[in-house]
Amino acid sequence: MGYPSIYPTGVTIYNKEKAYSGYTNFPSAKGAQLIDMNGNEVKLWAGLRRFPNKILPGGYVMGTTGARGGKYAYQDQLDLVQVDWDGHIVWKFDKTELVADPGKEPVYMARQHHDFQREGSTVGYYYPNGEPKTDSGNTLILTHENLYNHDISDKRLIDGKIIEVDWEGNIIWSWRASDHFDEPGFDEAAKNALFRNPGLHGEAGGDWMHINNFSTLGENKW
């Protein structure tokens, strides 16, 4: 699970009176791994990458099968998949964009990173009274889109984009961070700094508004 170390590895602290008993899913070098409270491997979905992995009711897991490579890539995943307990893909999305990197054949990709949510849950996985759907429903996916917006910078940008995808893989709604540049309240000094260097990552572009997660909101009782 890590580099050789003189420090203890595995489960190093387990206070049964204070720790809620259950299972932990985490990404390992081998794939999506499920362990018990003592660190014993309960299940391994070999080769299922993460960004992240989320367990759904019925023994399903969501993740990705691979990442975009090369100097034009920045954290882009090829797809978002749902696999069953045996690792068979039962749902897949990879049609955010047809990516044509120089010197490579064009390929459709999800360009997903960091977060996604399946309908029925505000976080993307099960919790009491919040059960994500496993055989239907829409999925919100955090993705990237390269563009130019001269209000932000004259450099090529890596924009944060949220898309909503139905069960058949159709994009039915989208939201881009760059369309809301005036809303965070950047002062002139911050805007000037962003314009000169919007978080550049070489040929991939400037990651000007790095988004890690999002959540849907419940109904407003007012």
Question: How should these model regions be labeled?
Answer:
Residues 1-222:
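Histidine-/acidic-rich catalytic cores in large beta-rich domains
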